[in-house]
């Protein structure tokens, strides 16, 4: 999302750095609409921009985006939604900048493994969790979702997924999902996995409202190291 905490932090830092180096920067919001973003890309190309930095609305749009910028011979940086190696090799003026999403997920699982009970708070021999996913179409969300749990199962820990819901990287949705799941599953929930910190902050609000305490009777993990999240650690 254009205005979520992570993208806002990224966008502001990017603009400050580029303008500090003397570049003229124009930023537009694709409004989570791939067709609109395609139009914006074409408009920038028509205007004769020197380079593009694009956070694709949809991972599946990578081929079309790459074809467009290659046809216009515009150097392009893709962020946040990683194309395949074959897609990246299609244009020699294309680069991708992003984190290792599988590693992020693995770190989440390892944090749970590092607790004294390895996430099995109620001692029933398994870790029961809910997963609040960002956007299932986003490769980072897919990998964080998969590898957070894989870290547990690879360590021989039995897991039980109570719920997996799409939170769209949004704090309010994270709170709503966690609130509803806490009402439905209660003390069965031992771990709340969130694909990003904004949703984790929302989940924390729901956990606190339910009278539970993180790292005591429930575990909660996110990704991004937002200041607001670090302040809660």
What residue spans do the PLM features occupy?
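A residue-level marker of the well-folded mature domains of exported/periplasmic proteins
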Residues: 1-233
